[in-house]
Design a protein with these regions (language model features):
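Structured, hydrophobic secondary-structure cores that serve as assembly/anchoring elements
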Residues: 49, 55, 76-107, 171-203
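Short, catalytically relevant binding-site loops at active-site mouths
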Residues: 131, 196-200, 237-238
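Active-site-surrounding "flap" and adjacent substrate/cofactor-binding loops of secreted or lumenal enzymes
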Residues: 64-75
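An anion-engaging/catalytic patch
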Residues: 61
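Residue-level signal for secondary-structure boundary elements
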Residues: 35, 121, 125, 137, ...
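Oligomerization/assembly interface segments of phage tail-like spikes and tubes
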Residues: 84-87, 111-113, 231, 277
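Alpha-helical scaffold segments that mediate packing/assembly in large oligomeric complexes
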Residues: 96-177, 295-301
Length: 301
């Protein structure tokens, strides 16, 4: 049909809609942010123990030909026990035909599983930083991160204590604990915080401060080191009410034991020949020494 001016009026009713033939991942953390900064180990069997030996001291000799003085050597064990994880998706046997020109999402699903694995690694590492470590001969003694290795949410260097986010004072407190514990100065010190802590840190510094440009670059991502800590941002850090637990640690302070990610693709005859894409992993992490980890409580109210 045409109008009085000869313009076809029904043509718009037949305009087509184009559909993308590919799949795009929605926003998410795609790579592990912490795995590179812990000690990676392999594991066989249901559990693994790590032998530890404590510091000893020498005694001055004051007499000639005196009986040899024997002192016991303090030793310890740390245990790690892997947990199994999986993720499975089904692709119906008719999906390839029904999707038409749209490709089957098999590759994007496998990529999605790998991204989930990366986030799981980070969550397990974070859990080990502040969680319970098992020690003793049989690994049944629960060892918590002591209060002496924690910077309180209301910590101030002077004046009246008040809840706060991440401050320069809290960073100094964490550094002091590491220095007091004689943490090897050659070991890289990692600081895991969320986006809110980076903003808080910038807010607490005056523009005229000599630290301002460094923190500004830290927030902008142009710099990742400040006050001797390499900063890693993670939104997976635990939060209770308005208080988020952030962590400072060194690489030797945490072990992540893994068997790697395995992905299986099988046709399920019991499910109408659907294609099953299933990824499995076995993971565990343990805090190796309490003195190598500092928990910093940050208010996000």
């Amino acid at each position: 049909m045409a109008d009085l001016n000869g313009v076809l009026t029904n043509v718009p009713n037949h305009f087509t809609t184009q559909f993308d033939s590919n799949w795009k991942h929605l926003v998410q953390q795609k790579n592990s942010k912490l795995k590179e900064y812990v000690t990676i180990d392999s594991i066989e069997g249901k559990e693994k123990s790590y032998n530890q030996i404590d510091a000893t001291s020498m005694t001055q000799i004051t007499d000639r030909s005196k009986d040899t003085r024997i002192s016991d050597q303090a030793m310890a064990k740390r245990w790690i026990r892997p947990t199994q994880y999986d993720c499975a998706k089904l692709v119906d046997e008719w999906d390839e035909q029904l999707l038409g020109e749209v490709v089957l999402p098999t590759s994007p699903i496998i990529q999605s599983h790998a991204q989930a694995y990366a986030r799981t690694c980070d969550s397990i590492i974070i859990g080990a930083l502040g969680g319970t470590a098992y020690t003793g001969t049989t690994g049944t003694t629960a060892t918590a991160l002591p209060a002496g290795q924690k910077v309180a949410v209301n910590f101030v260097e002077s004046g009246v204590a008040a809840n706060s986010g991440l401050t320069i004072a809290k960073l100094r407190a964490a550094k002091f604990l590491f220095d007091s514990n004689e943490i090897d100065e050659e070991e890289e010190r990692i600081m895991v915080v969320s986006a809110k802590q980076l903003q808080d840190l910038l807010r607490t510094i005056e523009v005229t401060s000599q630290d301002y440009n460094s923190v500004r670059a830290l927030v902008d991502g142009a710099l990742n080191t400040f006050m001797g800590f390499k900063f890693r941002r993670s939104q997976l850090l635990g939060k209770v009410s308005t208080v988020r637990s952030c962590y400072a640690y060194v690489k030797s302070g945490v072990i992540l034991a893994e068997r790697g990610l395995k992905t299986h693709m099988d046709v399920r005859t019991d499910l109408s020949h659907s294609l099953q894409i299933r990824s499995v992993a076995s993971l565990a992490a343990v805090r190796m020494e309490e003195k190598k980890v500092v928990e910093i409580a940050c208010d996000e109210a």
